[in-house]
């Protein structure tokens, strides 16, 4: 495989104005806990202790002042860890610790198939003990597990249940997949549920990763779309939210017919022709940060951004969407707002969706959102002026261009582009604009996909908010032919290409076929193999069964 390297040649500093700093971001992040592995849910108790589930199967209490971590529940030998599975969400009894119950969601290993479980534990002697299973779904699958929980003021337990990749079950009222469920706290079924004897409160959901109840009792969820239309929904008793025959607003002829037929409730907000990977959400109406009041605060995995969704005065419409610190820390999974209005978030940079330059050595982390100090400024520093990449013809390689913010305010990179004078380089940093936090270094990714042997030169440009001219850096790429001629390439046919669905790779004679699919940033999309076969078919999905966005992909056979 080609080796991607960078060489440090020079360093330069540029101080941005204080006015520019305040125009970019009002907030920054302060890291409070490090060294976690995919923290899925976080909660801060009245003593300032962090309660954290990690997908590997650990549930811990962490002292943020000392860093001491006390494991209260260890299910690492029992949870299924494939793709999105593991230990997931939790919620504490509203009168905890007087009522010492904690409700935990996880996926258990099984002899033949995994099982999605919600259990109630008793907190005693610094441990969670005496589990009582409230929900169990056999054949849980590997994705779309939901498992966010809220306890309402009338002491009912709400639980999101994704469709488990069984889309057709989301409309089946006899199935728990693709639903929002409602239980009494002992696991029994409330008498006022919409379907007698059933925990189903609403249906037609794909994968609800966020769940919150507002002070007025209204319920909102955040839900993943396929390749479009992540949604924020207001939940009503017995409501149908359309999956799998509608996503986002009912705006196509087919969706309009289905939505009318099934009385579908449309989302209050959606992401349109893209997905953000929406995760947890919470409601902010505290005095600590007035600019965030009357808003849903929503974290995203794919877009790696905290979003403020501001309500109108009646809280019936979202009237403003404000991205906060985009792509500054990688993927964001959990958010928790304390009683006094402090805001904590956790990263998810060790999961299957990780991307360069994450994870960093300290990942995963819990951070607090804090105001930028008055008069603070970002300070741009160039670390090197050239990126050197080596590769083979037709194969992807990547380089890293490190830049730094030596100031005490966040710095916004507005956009990055390649001059593309040779057609051999591409922008590996599609996530933009992005923010570089104070006292932080960020690697800007560049790509090299040579079409022929030789040495090539191009330029990458970085435009920083508050500076008129972009910073310009040199890209140098050297391409060589494959050291071992591969005559098999001519014997492989690929069809259909382009494709709107499955793609088949066919050989002339039976052989072992191996195919790796990557996007143009080099991220693994899918890999498969077959022995003594003449064909191998890719279903157009990612390795974790998600849909691929339209675009170009690189296949190695």
Question: Which residues fall in each region the model found?
Answer:
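Acidic, Gly/Ser/Thr-rich repeat motifs that build Ca2+-stabilized beta-propeller blades
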Residues: 24-167, 213, 217-225, 274-314, ...
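Beta-propeller domain segments
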Residues: 85-87, 95-97, 163-322, 330, ...
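Residue-level detector of functionally pivotal "anchor" positions at catalytic/ligand-binding pockets or at interdomain
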Residues: 374-385, 476-495
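Surface-exposed binding patches on compact interaction domains or structured appendages
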Residues: 377-378, 407-445
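Short, solvent-exposed loop/turn segments enriched in Ser/Thr/Gly
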Residues: 393-401, 442, 449-460
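Terminal connector regions
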Residues: 452-479
């Amino acid at each position: 495989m080609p080796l991607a390297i960078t060489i440090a040649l020079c360093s330069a500093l540029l101080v941005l104005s204080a006015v520019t700093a305040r125009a970019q971001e009002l907030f920054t992040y302060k890291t409070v806990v490090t060294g976690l592995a995919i923290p899925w849910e976080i909660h801060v108790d009245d003593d300032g202790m962090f309660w954290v589930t990690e997908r590997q199967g650990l549930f811990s209490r962490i002292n943020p002042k000392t860093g001491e971590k006390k494991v209260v529940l260890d299910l690492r030998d029992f949870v299924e860890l494939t793709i999105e599975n593991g230990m997931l969400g939790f919620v504490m009894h509203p009168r905890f610790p007087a009522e010492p119950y904690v409700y935990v969601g996880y996926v258990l290993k099984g002899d033949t198939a995994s099982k999605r479980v919600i259990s109630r534990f008793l907190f005693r002697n610094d441990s969670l003990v005496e589990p009582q299973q409230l929900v169990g779904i056999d054949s849980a699958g590997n994705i779309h597990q939901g498992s966010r929980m809220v306890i309402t003021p009338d002491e009912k337990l709400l639980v999101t249940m994704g469709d488990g990749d069984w889309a057709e079950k989301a409309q089946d009222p006899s199935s728990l997949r693709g639903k929002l469920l409602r239980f009494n706290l002992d696991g029994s079924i409330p008498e006022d549920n919409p379907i007698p004897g059933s925990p189903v409160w609403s249906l037609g959901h794909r994968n609800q990763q966020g769940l919150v109840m507002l002070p007025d009792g209204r319920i909102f969820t955040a839900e993943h779309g396929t390749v479009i239309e992540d949604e924020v929904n207001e939940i009503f008793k017995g409501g149908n939210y359309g999956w799998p025959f509608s996503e986002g607003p009912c705006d196509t002829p087919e969706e309009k017919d289905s939505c009318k037929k099934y009385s579908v409730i449309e989302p209050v907000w959606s992401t349109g022709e893209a997905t953000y990977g929406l995760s947890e959400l919470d409601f902010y109406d505290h005095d600590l940060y007035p600019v965030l009041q009357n808003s849903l605060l929503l974290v995203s995995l794919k877009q790696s951004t905290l979003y403020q969704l501001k309500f109108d005065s009646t809280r019936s419409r979202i009237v403003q969407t404000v991205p906060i610190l985009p792509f500054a820390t990688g993927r964001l999974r959990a958010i928790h707002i304390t009683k006094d209005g402090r805001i904590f978030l956790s990263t998810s940079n060790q999961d299957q969706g990780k991307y360069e330059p994450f994870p960093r050595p300290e990942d995963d982390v819990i951070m607090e959102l804090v105001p930028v100090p008055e008069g603070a400024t970002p300070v741009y520093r160039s670390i090197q002026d050239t990126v050197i990449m080596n590769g083979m013809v037709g194969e992807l390689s990547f380089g890293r261009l490190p830049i730094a913010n030596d100031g005490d305010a966040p710095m916004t990179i507005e956009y990055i582009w390649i001059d593309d004078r040779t057609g051999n380089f591409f922008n590996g940093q599609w996530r933009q604009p992005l923010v570089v936090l104070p006292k932080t270094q960020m690697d800007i990714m560049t790509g090299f996909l040579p079409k022929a042997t030789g040495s090539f030169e191009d330029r990458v440009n970085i435009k920083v908010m508050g500076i008129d001219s972009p910073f310009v850096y040199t890209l140098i790429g050297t391409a060589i032919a494959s050291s071992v001629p591969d005559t098999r390439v001519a014997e492989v046919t690929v069809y259909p290409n382009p494709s709107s669905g499955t793609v088949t790779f066919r050989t002339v004679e039976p052989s072992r076929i191996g195919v790796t699919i990557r996007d143009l940033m080099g991220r693994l999309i899918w890999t498969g193999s077959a022995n003594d076969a003449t064909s191998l078919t890719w279903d157009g999905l990612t390795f974790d069964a998600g849909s691929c966005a339209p675009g170009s992909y690189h296949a190695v056979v």
